[in-house]
């Protein structure tokens, strides 16, 4: 779902930072 996508994107951003 959309929430899952946002969670995955958030994890990606945190990892990149």
Swiss-Prot record:
Name the chain's protein: Ocellatin-5
User: Keyword Nucleotide-binding, does the record have it?
Assistant: no
Identify its protein family.
Answer: Belongs to the frog skin active peptide (FSAP) family. Ocellatin subfamily.
Q: Where in the cell is it found?
A: Secreted
Key words, A-Z: Amidation, Amphibian defense peptide, Antibiotic, Antimicrobial, Cytolysis, Hemolysis, Secreted
Q: What's in the GO CC field?
A: extracellular region
Could you tell me in which tissues this protein is expressed?
A: Expressed by the skin dorsal glands.
Source organism of the structure: Leptodactylus ocellatus
Give the protein's function.
Has hemolytic and antibacterial activities.
Q: Name one GO biological process term.
A: defense response to bacterium
Carrying Leucine amide, the residues are 17
């Amino acid at each position: 779902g959309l929430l899952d996508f946002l969670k995955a994107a958030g994890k990606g951003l945190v990892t990149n930072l």
